[in-house]
Amino acid sequence: MDLEISQIAYHVSDIRTACKNMYLQFAAGPFIISENIELANGEHRGKKTQFVHSSAYGQWGNIMLELVKQEDNSVNTPFREMYGPDEEGIHHTAVMVENFDKAVAHFDSFNMPLLTRCTTAKAHVDFGFIDARKKLGYMIEIYERSTTLLDFYQLVKNRAKEWDQKHLFFSV
């Protein structure tokens, strides 16, 4: 099973400030910000969840960087599972998989269970969080490889290659 890390994600308290800091400290960027991402459906620890989050996506060397903030007060979420609203730190790495259920079974066989499964409302992206905290200290996000996701990753990578470092944020 190909489980190459495609993204590293940090929970942050202020997305734009975090983007600026990642640029200044590590030359990461530029960033596209998706605000108030809603879910079509979601389940966390076997219970329905409808958290709202915002994410900034940028390039950090050869890997995508996500800076994520939960925007609502939901408590049953993969973000509140690890961090309070003002706390920051690594939340997950992400891998694209060929088959979601097979990936879940693979991780489960190593005592890393599926904690969260959701579908975004607008883009209809299915994703899940594997609880790898006992083994790695953070979660693993999984989603099935798709043209939509591959195109988005390529867009972010291309923007980084063409970046003149005059503008930290870009839109699509």
Q: PLM ranges: what are they?
A:
Residues 46-48, 118-119:
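Short linear motifs in intrinsically disordered
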Residues 39-46:
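N-terminal beta-loop-helix "entrance" segment that forms/cooperates
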Residues 39, 79, 114-120, 124-129:
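Intrinsic, low-complexity N-terminal interaction/targeting segments
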Residues 1-6, 10-32, 47-113, 131-172:
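Glyoxalase I/VOC metalloenzyme domain signal
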